[in-house]
Regions:
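Extracellular/lumenal glycan-associated surfaces
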Residues: 8, 26, 183-195, 199
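Non-catalytic DNA-recognition/assembly elements of restriction-modification systems
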Residues: 11-40, 179
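Loop/turn elements at beta-strand to alpha-helix junctions within RNA-recognition modules
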Residues: 17, 156, 177-179, 192
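Short, tandemly repeated low-complexity microdomains enriched for cysteine and small residues
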Residues: 22, 63, 198-208
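DNA target-recognition domains and sequence-specific DNA-contacting regions of bacterial/archaeal
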Residues: 28-175
Length: 210
């Protein structure tokens, strides 16, 4: 039986190749996270930064810049020697593996972190692509409705929901082969997200100025 080609209906001009579709476990490797609580973090004493699952759920957008001031530091007395090989890089992805609502599984893509020291913290699943991806593409795809529909039946728990590494590995990742097309898609969704945020801020100000 001939394999059906994955060709989106809407494309940027100049791109015609079918998209790839591969299992998560084929194109990502898992990294090590730590289990530091909020008590081990601060915002005053510069040190190694730490991405906490709660911040992924509440504070961070799909694309996270390493210079973001909402990323806390790890207290200087904490021994981080065993995490020396777990420092994050540009393009790495971090999932929140637990939540009290349907935001479980939210993912962020890291950018501008290569010159920094950043680790993945409590209740997170950090992973690194094994193949190149265009800037911004994965952060948007992994939070898209089509991907999150795959996650929904894999979530466990009632009051507190969670998702596991083993569940993620069989989900399907869809992407254009061309990195330029990937980056155009990433840029488009970044622009849309910024416009939505700006509109929400304007609506908030308008409400309280009346």
């Amino acid at each position: 039986m001939k394999e059906k080609k994955l060709v989106p209906k809407l494309r940027f001009p100049g791109f015609t190749e079918p998209w790839e579709q591969r299992k998560f476990g084929e194109i990502f490797e898992y990294l090590r996270n730590n289990t530091l609580s909020r008590d081990s973090l601060n915002y005053k004493n510069p040190n190694v930064k730490n991405i906490h699952y709660g911040d992924i759920l509440v504070k961070f957008d799909e694309i996270l810049d390493g210079s973001n001031k909402d990323i806390p530091y790890i207290n200087s007395e904490v021994d981080l020697s065993k995490f020396s090989k777990s420092l994050l890089r540009d393009g790495d992805i971090i999932f929140s593996d637990t939540a009290e609502d349907d935001t479980v599984g939210k993912a962020i893509e890291l950018q501008n972190v290569n010159a920094l020291f950043i680790l993945s913290g409590l209740h997170t699943i950090p992973c690194r692509p094994l193949i190149p991806f265009g800037k911004g593409y994965l952060g948007n795809f992994l939070n898209s409705d089509s991907y999150r529909l795959q996650l929904r039946p894999l979530v466990q728990g009632i009051k507190v929901s969670s998702i596991s590494k083993s569940a993620l590995k069989d989900t399907m990742i869809e992407y254009p082969k061309n990195l330029d097309e990937q980056e155009k898609i990433g840029s488009l969704f970044y622009y849309i997200a910024k416009m939505i945020t700006l509109h929400q801020e304007e609506s908030f100000l308008h409400k309280y100025m009346l």
